[in-house]
């Protein structure tokens, strides 16, 4: 079968045409891949950064955002049928630890990821445990279903706290941050402010319903950044700090600024992963009585049902997809992702 694989311990990704079709077991499902989306994690693997060098076994078929069709299943599988349109949870968990047994599988300490630790979805076929498979309703396209993984991250982050009538600050306008704008607006947030240094994506955020999308690139230091943010807050009628903060960037200055402008009793969801150590004003957290929640992946499977219901209720995520390419143009897709001048990039696996 055709696949995209990390074949060498150096930057790049390579297409192969003779990868074996994976074998499925008693409780597994064999999925024919129709669409995949390129994730920031895939870009890290492509660039072969320090995290990738320490994490990714080579060779490895990568990718974990997908939509496809069930073409075979093990004898023990009763939850899906051949012909079903599906996506799937890319985090594989042990099922036996305290958190798994308590229904909190997203907190399994033995989690491994498809396309990271085991064969991924950038291939014509993928094997996945049936318990990880999620049926796609007829009303949701394959393109949108292939973005369920990052959309689930956005849903989990944004809906960890009530957004209705609240003032929301989002730091980081990558695809997940942009999805969070849509989610916050759909859920009735009062004001939504988002920050980034990428003007292309900030304009997308404005189009998605952000009250203000602030380019923070011009500000030379933390004091200037906070001063400008307070001006923005005043200009849009805010008399107190932000009620909810959604941290998507992993950037120290963004986190410090967020702590500075949160209201007393504010709540923060932290999804962004830093490349290094982060220093924070512990006093701001204590004296403001802030609540912080770390986010990793999606709640299995409450997040999946939530995003499906919201899409069916009219939340339009189609504009997050800015580029659609055939798999043979994968190199172009990665170059577009590297440029940052895009939302989600979809790869079509049809022949």
UniProtKB/Swiss-Prot annotation:
Subcellular location field: Cytoplasm
Binding site for Zn(2+) 1: 39, 64-65
InterPro entries xrefs: ADH-like_C, ADH-like_N, ADH_Zn_CS, GroES-like_sf, L-Threonine_3-DHase, NAD(P)-bd_dom_sf, Zn_alcohol_dh
EC number: 1.1.1.103
PROSITE patterns, A to Z: ADH_ZINC (PS00059)
Keyword Cytoplasm attributed: yes
Superkingdom assignment: Bacteria
Principal location listed in the UniProt entry: cytoplasm
Keywords: Cytoplasm, Metal-binding, NAD, Oxidoreductase, Zinc
Active site (catalytic residues): 41 (charge relay system), 44 (charge relay system)
Role summary: Catalyzes the NAD(+)-dependent oxidation of L-threonine to 2-amino-3-ketobutyrate.
Protein name (database record): L-threonine 3-dehydrogenase
Organism the protein comes from: Francisella tularensis subsp. tularensis (strain SCHU S4 / Schu 4)
């Amino acid at each position: 079968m055709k696949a995209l694989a990390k074949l060498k311990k150096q930057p790049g990704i390579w297409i192969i045409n003779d990868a074996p079709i994976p074998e499925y077991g008693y409780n597994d499902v064999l999925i024919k891949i129709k669409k995949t989306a390129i994730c920031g994690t895939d870009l890290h693997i492509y660039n072969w950064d320090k995290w990738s060098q320490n994490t990714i076994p080579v060779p490895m078929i990568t990718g974990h955002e997908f939509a496809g069709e069930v073409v075979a299943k093990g004898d023990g599988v009763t939850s899906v049928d051949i012909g079903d349109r599906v996506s799937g949870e890319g985090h594989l968990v042990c099922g036996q630890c305290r958190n798994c047994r308590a229904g909190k599988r997203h907190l399994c300490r033995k989690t491994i990821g498809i396309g990271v630790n085991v064969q991924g979805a950038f291939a014509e076929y993928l094997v996945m445990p049936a318990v990880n498979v999620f049926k796609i309703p007829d009303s949701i396209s394959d393109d949108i279903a292939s973005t369920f993984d990052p959309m689930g991250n956005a849903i989990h982050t944004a809906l960890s706290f009530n957004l209705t009538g609240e003032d929301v600050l989002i730091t980081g306008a990558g695809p997940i941050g942009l999805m969070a704008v849509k989610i916050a607006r759909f859920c009735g947030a009062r004001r939504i402010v988002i920050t980034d240094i990428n003007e292309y994506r900030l304009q997308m955020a404005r189009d998605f319903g952000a009250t203000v999308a602030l380019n923070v690139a011009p500000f030379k230091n933390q004091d200037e950044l906070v001063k400008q943010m307070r001006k923005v807050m005043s200009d849009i009628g805010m008399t107190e700090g932000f009620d909810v903060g959604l941290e998507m960037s992993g950037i120290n200055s963004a986190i410090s600024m967020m702590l500075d402008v949160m209201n007393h009793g504010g709540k923060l969801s932290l999804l962004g992963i830093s490349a290094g150590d982060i220093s924070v004003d512990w006093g701001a957290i204590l004296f403001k009585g802030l609540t912080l929640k770390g986010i990793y992946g999606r709640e299995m499977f409450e997040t999946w049902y939530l995003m499906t219901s919201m899409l069916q209720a009219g939340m339009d995520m189609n504009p997050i997809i800015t580029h659609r390419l055939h798999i043979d143009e994968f190199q172009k897709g990665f170059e577009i992702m590297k440029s940052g001048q895009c939302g989600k990039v979809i790869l079509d696996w049809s022949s």
